[in-house]
Design a protein with these regions (language model features):
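Short beta-strand edge/turn micro-motifs at domain boundaries
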Residues: 121-148
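Short beta-strand segments enriched in hydrophobic/aromatic residues
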Residues: 51, 107-109, 141-142
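Outer-membrane beta-barrel domain signature
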Residues: 113-115
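A short, structured loop/turn motif at beta-sheet edges
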Residues: 93-101, 128-134
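A short hydrophobic beta-strand element
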Residues: 99-109
Length: 150
């Protein structure tokens, strides 16, 4: 009977999907997906929770560097209650080590102006780090994605 249970156990273990075991790339991208969902709430405090406490943000529409939680909240305060949205269009991932991952790509911010949706293509680079058991954004650079005119 013991042999039977061993066989059942091994069979069940082999049936588990490999995707259930996430690595640094998956964890970092999940953190960025949480950031995007938080941005879509238009709540600065919710957005800021996705950043490390000592994070640096070079925001799309800011002439200054935002450093630390309070500065990041201040940066996102103008989005509060606006209905602005973010959608990640494309990304690439570079694993630095088991606790640091760089993700770069394109996203689109859609802001509401007089009830009309105005898309703003942008590009980003984020350094996502594991602090303790949590992944957070340590560095975030965002800028408009302006296509060259022919």
């Amino acid at each position: 009977m013991t042999r039977f249970f061993q066989l059942v156990f091994v069979t069940l273990m082999l049936m588990l999907p490999a995707a259930a075991i996430a690595g640094p790339a998956e964890d970092a991208n999940a953190a960025i997906d949480r950031w995007s969902a938080a941005f879509n709430t238009n709540d600065p405090e919710t957005i800021a929770k996705n950043y490390c406490s000592d994070a640096i943000l070079l925001g799309t529409v800011s002439p200054v560097i935002s450093e630390g939680t309070q500065a990041i909240i201040k940066y996102f305060t103008p989005t509060k209650g606006t209905g602005n949205k973010n959608a990640i269009d494309e990304r690439r991932t570079i694993i630095i080590n088991d606790s640091a991952v760089v993700v770069t790509g394109f996203y689109t911010f859609t802001r509401m102006v007089e009830g009309k949706a105005m898309p703003g293509p942008s590009r980003f680079t984020m350094l996502v780090t594991k602090r303790g058991n949590e992944w957070c954004i340590a560095h975030h650079h965002s800028s408009p994605h302006v296509l060259p005119k022919n």
